[in-house]
């Protein structure tokens, strides 16, 4: 755990003010919930579409959320979920030259993707809405990500070098620490066995067919969600989503998407980490908190914000006490 060396009451006050401002913003968003369009297509794909009355004048933001992450990998597939995320920016059905190339050629640089243990998220933001053809094309990128990624041997070899270099850059003391303590933090669950990027041996040996198999198994409409927010007419974009994404086929025999949990330990767990490159002494205290499943809407939002606020303030305050209130 990294602790700040200094902490002041003013810093605490500023943090509280910022968090309160975020809270007010969320409540304001709930007051405008009438603009939200949500639904589920017959193939199982979920969508959320809303007009942003605030800071998105003239632009829109597009997201594709996959209920697919590293936890769904078997022992021979470790690292595939993250590798597939990289592959999605290469050749696709409607963008054979590569999605990343197409986006940059049109001045769209605010795009990103992230793979976690539970999910994978893609985003293309700050898309001008004055040209409907551009937003339609961006929606087609999301559509291709759903089931139209071209996973070729050539692209696989190119991304292999990129991902292996990413693995090497991450192979730091902090990464080795997080991997080492995972067994106690996650109580030897599947979360402890999947660190997203995967082991080097897997990255060196995976094939295009391996990636294709994972893609065809898990990237499917019942595990996908499209989110569009911005200076848009939600009714118009809802019709576009239905027309564009409704044709995605749901597999007749789909693999069951398992839900993974972390069992409570009966006594506190402890791990001592020693590394030759570690230049500092530190300690960490972890408390697992169950995600509330019964909360919905505003109550769920407030609970989420409270946890984020606590996680932000607590380490700073402990650092403040450690440094004799300086």
Predicted regions located by residue number:
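Bacterial N-terminal signal peptides
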Residues: 14-25
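Boundary at the C-terminal end of the N-terminal hydrophobic targeting segment
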Residues: 29-31
């Amino acid at each position: 755990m990294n602790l700040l060396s200094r902490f002041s009451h003013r810093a605490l006050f500023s943090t509280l003010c910022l968090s309160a401002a975020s809270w007010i913003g969320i409540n304001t968003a709930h007051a405008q919930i009438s603009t939200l369009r949500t639904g589920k297509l017959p193939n199982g794909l979920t969508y959320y579409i809303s007009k942003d009355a605030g800071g998105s004048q003239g632009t829109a933001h597009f997201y594709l959320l996959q209920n697919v992450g590293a936890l769904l990998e078997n022992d021979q597939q470790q690292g595939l979920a993250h590798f597939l995320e990289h592959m999605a920016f290469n050749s696709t059905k409607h963008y054979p030259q590569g999605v990343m190339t197409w986006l940059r050629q049109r001045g769209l640089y605010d795009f990103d993707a992230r793979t976690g243990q539970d999910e994978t998220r893609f985003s293309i933001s700050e898309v001008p809405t004055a040209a409907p053809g551009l937003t339609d094309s961006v929606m087609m990128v999301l559509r291709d990500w759903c089931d139209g990624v071209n996973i070729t041997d050539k692209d696989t070899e190119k991304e292999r070098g990129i991902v292996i270099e990413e693995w090497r850059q991450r192979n730091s003391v902090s990464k080795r620490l997080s991997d080492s303590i995972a067994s106690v933090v996650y109580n030897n669950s599947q979360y402890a066995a999947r660190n997203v990027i995967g082991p080097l041996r897997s990255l060196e040996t995976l094939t295009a067919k391996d990636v294709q198999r994972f893609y065809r198994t898990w990237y499917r409409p019942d595990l996908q969600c499209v989110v569009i927010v911005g200076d848009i007419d939600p009714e118009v974009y809802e019709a576009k989503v239905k027309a564009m994404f409704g044709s995605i086929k749901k597999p007749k025999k789909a693999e069951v998407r398992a839900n993974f949990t972390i069992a409570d330990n009966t006594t506190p767990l402890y791990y001592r980490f020693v590394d030759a490159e570690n230049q500092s002494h530190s300690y960490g205290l972890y408390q697992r908190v169950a995600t509330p499943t019964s909360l919905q809407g505003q109550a769920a939002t407030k609970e989420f914000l409270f946890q984020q606020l606590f996680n932000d303030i607590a380490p700073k305050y402990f650092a403040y006490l450690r440094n004799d209130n300086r």
